[in-house]
């Protein structure tokens, strides 16, 4: 039996573009985790997630920001060329992958447009804000779709997910590289409080021992951040005077 206590990972964005990317990642992971929409409740969860993602995509220049970041990551990799002992074949491989992700994202139609234009998604999306608004008498189209053969529904879901692949692949690679750019280091909070300089970071990643039953309340931006640890049990929980946790600035 392992004597290593489990930990909980928290991530906090330090700017608006990272906030948007993390939300998109969260929604895309949910969409790709739902394959067989065998029941209406499962299907409605899927359609709500699609609607949420479309709302996020409509708020900003998602494609432009991702393309800029893909280019920035390529430039960062170029800097490794002058470092002795670096595996340049791996660096070149990553740069080629970044170029491919960028080209696919650039050539893709307007992000989410095919989902917006899909008749079933559009009908369901219009009714989601109404409590109980997706009943069979409100949405007979959805009711009929749920009675179609499972394979037909699976094919529809796969086609919808496929339209998001240029976004999903670019976003996944960008976030992977950003997360890998920061190493976890042990830190100590005093009386539940910790603050430091962000040094131009985009993302804070924080690991806390689950046994403490604490969660972080983080505020910050690209130059400075502050963390306050709060007990999950607001009445009986205790925050140690000195708390060791792991922190990575990415």
Swiss-Prot record:
Coiled coil: none annotated. One of its GO terms (cellular component) is cytoplasm. Pfam families: ZapD. It is found in: Cytoplasm. InterPro entries: ZapD, ZapD_C, ZapD_sf. Keywords: Cell cycle, Cell division, Cytoplasm, Septation. Disulfide bonds: none annotated. It comes from the Bacteria. GO terms for biological process: division septum assembly; FtsZ-dependent cytokinesis. Cell division factor that enhances FtsZ-ring assembly. Directly interacts with FtsZ and promotes bundling of FtsZ protofilaments, with a reduction in FtsZ GTPase activity. Belongs to the ZapD family. Interacts with FtsZ. This is Cell division protein ZapD. It comes from Serratia proteamaculans (strain 568). The gene is zapD.
